[in-house]
C-alpha cells in the first residue's frame, strides 16, 4: 500500500520508494528529510478538502508536509 492510502494516526515502515516517478530535486529533498527505505513514518494529519492534500508526516522527531502525489511514490507496510 502506498503512503497516500493511510489515515491519520497510522504508523508504517517505508519498504520502497519509486524514485523514478519523482523529479530529481524532489527526490533529493525527500532523502534529506529521512524519507527512505526502512524509515518509520506516522501520518499525523491530512488535508480536509477535496484531495485531502497535503499530508503531515512524522519521521523521527520531524514533522513534514508531503503532497499526495509524492506520497503515492512511497510504498509502506503498516506497523
Annotate each language-model stretch with its function.
Residues 1-3, 77:
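Cytosolic, membrane-proximal regulatory domains of ion/volume homeostasis and mechanosensation machinery
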Amino acid at each position: 500500500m502506498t503512503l497516500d492510502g493511510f489515515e491519520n494516526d497510522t504508523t508504517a515502515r517505508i519498504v520502497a520508494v519509486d524514485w523514478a516517478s519523482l523529479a530529481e530535486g524532489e527526490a533529493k529533498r525527500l532523502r534529506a528529510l529521512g524519507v527512505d527505505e526502512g524509515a518509520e513514518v506516522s501520518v499525523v494529519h491530512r488535508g480536509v478538502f477535496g484531495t485531502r492534500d497535503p499530508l503531515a508526516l512524522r519521521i523521527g522527531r520531524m514533522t513534514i508536509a508531503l503532497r499526495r502525489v509524492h506520497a503515492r511514490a512511497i510504498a509502506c507496510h503498516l506497523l
